[in-house]
Structures are given as structure tokens and as C-alpha cells.
């Protein structure tokens, strides 16, 4: 899901080694060293709205460096994944750097070992290739839905390839006999010069990197003489560019209409596998068109592979993104594989299940995703992220599809899930299914799965006390798997909940394993998770499961009804404190959201009789000591947050305020049903009075009107701003005069734009204002920034 965060890539500045692009640096004197200087502001990947601040900081640093350390030479410039520079200078002068303005840290250079020369071996891919690469993906087509692919890169050398009949397709100047499709899916009205091009050397690094992992040519020489290969090195590549530069001014993004169009084109072009290393917060899955399109692609015989997301460090469990929630897709988490003997460890950024709203068990599998070397335009780079893990699985799927053309998409998925091997979690324990699904893919085992399972994994969802539920797993012979298998339920170390999984002792394949989950009256809340193991002699196959024993304490409140939109006054003072945690996601402190709310709650019930685009609340005023904040939940249950939208944080990647605190909570594309908003606080001392606005179905932007086209010198330009739905979002306001960003203040329905420093005469004002609903929108809305109004007018000063 988009800017780099939503593209689910974590790239470390010191890892990036791009051949042919590095600026010239000269060694100055003896004892020259190269270090990395980090400046005060966070990088764009963490704070996308701070581009101007970062640019100003960097300019100030370079000016000061030239004056105070004239022997220093700037090499790499970092903005996306770090804010700073690499600097070469005499070792004796390094201490001078810490005294320069804006310097936060000075780090020594570090050397990292690229891994794409090892990761195919780590998942067992070369064993399937054959001595002449006859079964290395020959004839398979992998569609890369991403930011574009550099077809001229040596990793995609077309020598020895003949395109299939009817290919190449699309923008043929960006195709070869290896990269056989080049299409772009830009949003309507995109004005960036490269928006309509299937490849842009400045913005196609991510897609080129992903494509190389999936299907880069075997035995290609990369940085430092490393010899690298993609997982399915003889497969063809289809380039379906959806991440394009947008008018929002932020990093490339894609909305659902463009992504769905790309999926449809990939299916129409006959791709065997689709890889989508992007994502965003989950919405109601029955209304998630991208997830539904991937399910449809699977039904059409195309294997959909999706990155699980990179949000675990930020928001904890329940962070798997859309469209990794697609039921039929292979959602992929990331692991780091290192050491001798090798050890597989869950990557600390890799999103952990369940899915946020649908509570599905995802990811399905895991694959290498840390420090992976692959192609980028003009050279090579090492990136980390589930974006890098997913194409390992896409390549693996292509290998299996070539070797087993009779397998269905569901059978191929089962072969990878049921044969996975364990990774470790951050505590050194065997990782639970929420971290790795069936485990790290192991291609030699997946090539001979013995049995196919349907479903491949089980989510029990939320389990109430004094309840039981039943289900079944269909097992079929995949070749050599017929006969009696022993069955056992093995719980993970993190499975702390009370409850019992009841299984038969054995199963005769083909056949059905029936199960029952029983939760007693006094069961302890927590996760009920592990594997249903199938054993026959030395053979082991397994089906992952997850559920959570949960108590809906919020339902014990006497809730008030919100029957119509409007402005309300309320207080939490004197109310019961029944709930301290809300989920999912479970631990959003990494994005500045309070995780434990020990104060009292005031609860309002909301009943939706029909489908709407959205609804929500925003706190517009608090009492002097009040620290109340909102949480939106479904079914009046604190265990059913309406996803990221239910938290008081802006999560629209097109806004500069992305992941900033906002006193609003809501739901995007909700189904009819019962919801509740809980007003809560971190402590009892934070209880107090507050005023809030409640809206339903806000799909229109604010209204803006220039008050006067003539403004006295040094006086502000004034624009009336109003919004009858969610209300004007003051922090969203961006104003420029003649292209220069200027201060703007919203008060009493007026936006006042500073004209200080501008000469008398005619000027051009561009004012962008969003409402609070915009802070909750994602790429799943049909248009970019539908709740934002941009006013462009001329005025005369003086």
C-alpha cells in the first residue's frame, strides 16, 4: 500500500549501493574516512510532509560544512530513508561535524553483505531449476504491479529469450524479449511529466528491485562481484506501473481504480503470477475492491502474491494490510536468515496477524526480506521489507506452476503453506502463525507436498467464554499422500488463552478433519494459536490456526444513542473505567497513539441502517484538564476497532499530516450494523468534559470563498472555509503565494494567509483545505483527496 511506507519497503540508507549513480567523492589528505551525518528532522519515509524542512536543513548544513570543514566532500544525499549525507573528510576533522547546525548524529560507515546471492538457496530454489535451467520458470509470466521496471537493466538481459506469441505488449519502447509487457495506470488528470510512462528512472527503483528478486537472470554479476539470481530466473516479466507521482506532491501513490485496472490487465495478458508489494490499512473486506480483484484473479487461474506490510514495529499485532487480506492470495511476511547453521528470525518490521478488521489469519507464509540485493535503475541496491519477501514467493509460485501445470491456484498455495518451516520470534521462541503463517517457504518440500489442505489456515476469530465452534479441513492426496496420518494440535508458546481444540487422532487421506473449539466460562483472554500437525512417519505437514478468547467489557456500559449528525457536549467524569486496551491494531504507540487507556469511558452507540461511505467523530473542544480521545469500534466491542480509521491518527498517505495525531476516529466503507464510539483517556486524571462533532457519509470537500481580491499591504488574504460534514481540518491547510509556501491560520471560519514580504501588485494564491474525513481516507477511495478543496485565485496587494 503509495508512499514508501505504504509500498511496504524499509530501505536503510547505509545499505544502498547504486552502481554508476554515486556522486564523485575525492579522498582529501591522509587518513580520510567516510561517515554518515544525520540531521534533526526525520526522513521522508517517516514524515512525508516535511520535504521543505528537510531541504532547508540540508542546505544549511552544506553551507556550514563548506565554511567550517572545507576539506570535506559530500557523497550520498539521503532524504527518503534518512535525513543527511555521507561525507568524506580527514579523520581528525570528524569532531567538527557534531558542532554544525542541525546535526543529530555522526555515524561510521558500515558494510553490509547483500543477500540475493543467497536467498534463492535459502528457500531451496536452485534445486528446482535443473542443470540447464529448464525448470527455472521457463515460459512462466510474472506480473509486477508496482512503480515500473527498468527493462534495460543487465539483470533482465534479453539475450537468449524469445517473447511468447502476441508479445511484447503495451509501451513497447520499455519492453524486451524478457520484460514482455509495459503498461501504466495513471489516475485521471495526473499532470506529472512521467505519469503516463511505464518506466521512470527516478521513481521505478522499487518495481525494478521487486522484479529482480522474482525473475532476475541467473548468474548475473552485481555490486562487489557478487553473482546473483532471481528466484525464477527464466520467467518473463510483465511491468504494470501503478505507483505514479501525484498532484499531492508526495511520493508516488496509487488508488484502487488504477490497481484494479492493472490486475485486470495482468490477467488479460495471461500472467501466471501477480506480485503486488504495496498496501494500506484494511477496510471492510467485502468492500475492498483490490482484495476482491485479487481473489477474482485467483479464480481466473493467476496466483496473487502480496506483501503483508511493515507495520509491526509501529502498531503491533493486527497490522496486516490490504490487499494482503485477500482470502485467496498468498500474503507474505519477512524473515532474516543468517548464521551458520542458518537461523530464520521474524523481521521486526514485518506485519503480524490477524488482519485488522476481518480477523483473518495472515500472513500465509514468510520469506527472506532483510538486506536483499537486487536491481535498481542504473545499478544495484539492498532493501528490506515485506516488499522484498513477496517476490521470493512470486518466483517460487512460478517455479511450481511450471513444474506442476495441473495444480490449481488453491493447490499451489497449499503446497507452499503446508510445507513451511519455522522461524523464531524476537524472544527466540518458535514464531506463532500470526508471524509466519505456515512458515518460511521451503521449495523442495513444496515441490512434493504430499497433501493439499482446504482451507490452508484457520481463523477462529474472537471466541467468547462459554462458547464452542466447529469446522473442517479437507485433505486431498497431492501425490504419495494417500493413507493414514496422525493428527495433533500443537499450541504456540504465545498461546495463553483458555480453551481447547478437539481433533481426531488420525485421518485417512483423502478425507476431512473435523475440529471443535471449546471455551469454558472462566477462560483466560488471549491468543489461542498454533498448528494442526499431520504426521506420517518422518513426514510432517501442518495447518496454522489462530483465535482470540475475548471479553467485550464495553458492552457493560449504559451507552447513549447517536441518532443524527451534529455537535454534542459530553463528559467522562464519574463514568466507569471498564476498558484499558482496544484492538486491532493492538499496540499503536509507534505512531503516537496511546495504547493503554486506564481512564473512565463515555460510550455512544451508532446504528447504521444502510451502507455509507464513512462516518466518524472529532473532538472539537476539551475542558481545561480533559485529555479525552476517541476510539471507534464495531459491535460495541473494544476488540473490534474499525481498523486504523478507529484510532485518533491521520492515515491518509496523500496528506502531509500522514500518521500525525488527530482528535478524530471513524470508519471507512462500513457495513450496516451496530457500532460505538468510546471516549477514553490514558488516566483517571485525564477525564473531563469535551465537545464533539458526529458525521455520516461525508463525501464532499470544504467550501472556500475569497473574501476580497484586493488586500492592503502586509495584511492577510482571507478566505471563508466551511464544512457541513466532518468540519474543517486546520492542520491540513497548505497555502502558497506565487509558488512560495506561506503561513496560514484558521480561526472562526476564516483562513488568514500571510502576505508579509510580498511586494505590491498582482499575486497568485493557491489554498488547499481538507476536512477531518480526509484524514481517514485511504487509497481505497475512488479519487485522490475527495474531501479536499484546492482554491486557486489571483489577488492584488497594496
Q: Regions from the language model: what does each represent?
A:
Residues 535, 550-578, 604, 632-645, ...:
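C-terminal edge strands of extracellular/lumenal beta-sandwich accessory domains
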Residues 136-138, 239-328, 355-360, 374-391, ...:
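Substrate-binding/access-modulating region of protease and related hydrolase catalytic domains
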Residues 211-215, 219, 242-243, 272, ...:
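Hydrolase catalytic cores
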Residues 30, 130-255, 269-272, 299-301, ...:
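Subtilisin-like serine protease catalytic core
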Residues 173-191, 324-398:
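Extracellular S/T/G-rich loop segment that most often corresponds to the catalytic His/Ser-adjacent loop
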Residues 75-77, 82, 95-160, 189-192, ...:
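Protease zymogen maturation seam
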Residues 23-115:
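Inhibitory N-terminal propeptides of secreted protease zymogens
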Residues 493, 589-651:
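Acidic, Ser/Thr/Pro-rich low-complexity intrinsically disordered segments
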Amino acid at each position: 500500500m503509495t508512499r514508501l511506507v505504504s509500498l511496504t519497503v524499509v530501505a536503510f540508507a547505509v545499505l544502498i549501493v547504486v552502481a554508476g549513480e554515486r556522486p564523485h567523492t575525492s579522498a582529501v589528505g591522509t587518513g580520510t574516512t567516510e561517515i554518515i551525518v544525520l540531521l534533526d528532522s526525520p526522513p521522508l519515509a517517516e514524515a512525508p510532509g516535511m520535504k521543505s524542512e528537510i531541504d532547508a536543513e540540508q542546505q544549511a548544513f552544506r553551507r556550514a560544512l563548506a565554511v567550517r570543514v572545507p576539506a570535506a566532500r559530500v557523497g550520498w544525499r539521503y532524504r527518503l530513508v534518512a535525513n543527511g549525507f555521507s561525507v568524506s573528510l580527514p579523520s581528525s576533522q570528524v569532531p567538527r561535524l557534531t558542532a554544525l547546525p542541525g546535526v543529530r548524529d555522526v555515524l561510521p560507515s558500515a558494510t553490509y553483505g547483500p543477500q540475493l546471492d543467497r536467498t534463492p538457496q535459502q528457500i531451496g530454489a536452485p534445486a528446482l531449476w535443473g542443470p540447464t535451467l529448464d525448470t527455472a520458470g521457463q515460459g512462466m509470466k510474472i506480473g509486477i504491479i508496482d512503480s515500473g521496471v527498468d527493462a534495460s537493466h543487465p539483470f533482465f538481459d534479453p539475450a537468449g529469450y524469445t517473447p511468447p506469441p502476441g508479445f511484447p505488449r503495451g509501451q513497447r519502447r520499455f519492453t524486451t524479449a524478457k520484460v514482455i509487457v509495459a503498461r501504466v495506470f495513471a489516475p485521471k488528470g495526473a499532470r506529472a511529466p512521467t505519469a503516463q510512462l511505464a518506466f521512470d528512472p527516478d521513481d521505478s527503483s522499487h518495481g525494478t528491485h521487486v522484479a529482480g528478486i522474482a525473475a532476475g537472470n541467473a548468474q548475473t554479476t552485481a555490486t562487489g562481484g557478487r553473482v546473483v539470481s532471481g528466484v525464477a530466473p527464466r520467467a518473463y516479466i510483465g511491468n504494470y506501473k501503478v505507483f505514479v507521482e501525484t498532484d499531492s506532491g508526495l511520493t508516488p501513490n496509487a488508488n484502487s481504480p488504477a490497481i484494479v485496472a492493472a490486475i485486470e490487465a495482468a490477467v488479460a495478458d495471461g500472467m501466471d503470477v501477480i506480485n503486488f508489494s504495496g498496501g494500506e490499512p484494511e477496510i471492510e473486506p467485502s468492500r475492498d475492491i483490490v482484495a476482491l480483484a485479487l481473489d477474482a484473479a485467483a479464480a481466473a487461474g493467476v496466483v496473487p502474491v502480496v506483501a503483508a506490510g511493515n507495520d509491526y514495529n509501529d502498531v503491533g499485532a493486527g497490522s496486516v494490510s490490504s490487499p494482503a487480506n485477500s482470502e485467496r492470495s498468498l500474503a507474505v511476511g519477512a524473515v532474516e536468515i543468517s548464521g551458520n547453521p542458518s537461523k530464520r528470525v521474524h523481521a521486526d518490521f514485518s506485519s503480524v496477524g490477524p488482519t485488522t478488521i476481518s480477523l483473518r489469519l495472515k500472513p500465509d507464509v514468510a520469506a527472506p526480506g532483510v538486506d536483499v540485493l537486487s536491481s535498481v535503475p542504473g545499478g544495484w541496491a539492498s532493501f528490506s521489507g515485506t516488499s522484498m519477501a513477496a517476490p521470493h514467493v512470486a518466483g517460487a509460485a512460478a517455479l511450481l506452476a511450471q513444474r506442476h501445470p495441473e495444480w490449481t491456484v488453491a493447490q499451489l498455495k497449499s503446497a507452499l503453506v503446508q510445507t513451511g518451516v519455522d522461524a523464531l520470534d524476537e524472544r527466540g521462541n518458535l514464531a506463532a502463525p500470526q508471524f509466519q503463517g505456515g512458515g518460511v517457504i521451503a521449495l523442495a518440500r513444496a515441490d512434493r507436498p504430499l497433501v493439499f489442505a482446504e482451507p490452508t489456515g484457520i481463523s477462529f476469530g474472537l471466541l467468547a467464554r462459554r462458547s464452542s465452534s466447529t469446522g473442517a479441513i479437507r485433505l486431498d492426496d497431492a501425490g504419495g499422500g494417500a493413507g493414514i496420518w496422525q493428527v495433533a494440535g500443537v499450541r504456540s508458546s504465545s498461546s495463553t488463552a483458555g480453551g481447547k481444540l478437539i481433533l481426531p487422532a488420525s485421518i485417512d487421506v483423502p478425507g476431512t478433519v473435523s475440529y471443535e473449539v471449546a471455551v469454558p466460562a472462566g477462560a483466560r483472554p488471549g491468543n489461542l494459536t498454533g498448528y494442526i500437525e499431520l504426521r506420517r512417519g518422518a513426514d510432517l505437514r501442518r495447518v496454522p490456526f489462530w483465535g482470540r478468547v475475548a471479553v467485550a467489557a464495553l458492552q457493560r456500559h449504559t451507552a447513549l444513542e447517536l441518532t443524527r449528525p451534529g455537535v454534542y457536549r459530553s463528559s467522562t467524569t464519574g463514568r466507569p473505567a471498564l476498558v484499558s486496551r482496544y484492538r486491532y491494531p493492538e499496540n499503536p504507540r509507534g505512531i503516537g497513539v496511546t495504547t493503554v487507556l486506564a481512564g473512565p469511558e463515555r460510550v455512544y452507540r451508532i446504528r447504521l441502517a444502510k451502507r455509507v461511505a464513512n462516518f466518524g467523530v472529532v473532538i472539537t473542544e476539551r475542558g481545561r484538564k480533559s485529555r479525552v480521545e476517541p476510539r471507534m469500534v464495531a459491535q460495541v466491542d473494544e476488540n473490534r476497532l474499525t481498523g486504523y480509521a478507529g484510532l485518533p491518527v491521520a492515515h491518509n498517505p496523500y496528506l502531509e499530516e500522514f500518521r500525525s495525531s488527530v482528535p478524530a476516529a471513524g470508519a471507512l466503507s462500513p457495513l450496516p450494523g451496530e457500532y460505538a464510539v468510546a471516549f477514553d483517556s490514558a488516566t483517571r486524571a485525564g477525564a473531563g468534559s469535551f465537545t464533539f462533532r458526529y458525521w455520516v457519509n461525508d463525501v464532499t470537500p470544504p467550501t472556500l470563498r475569497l473574501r476580497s481580491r484586493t488586500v492592503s499591504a502586509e495584511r492577510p488574504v482571507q478566505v471563508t472555509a466551511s464544512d457541513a460534514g466532518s468540519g474543517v481540518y486546520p492542520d491540513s491547510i497548505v497555502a502558497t503565494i506565487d509558488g512560495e509556501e506561506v503561513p496560514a491560520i484558521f480561526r472562526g471560519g476564516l483562513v488568514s494567509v500571510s502576505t508579509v514580504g510580498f511586494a505590491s501588485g498582482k499575486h497568485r494564491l493557491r489554498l488547499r483545505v481538507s476536512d477531518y474525513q480526509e484524514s481517514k481516507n485511504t487509497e481505497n477511495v475512488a479519487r485522490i483527496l475527495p474531501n479536499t478543496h484546492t482554491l486557486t485565485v489571483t489577488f492584488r496587494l497594496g
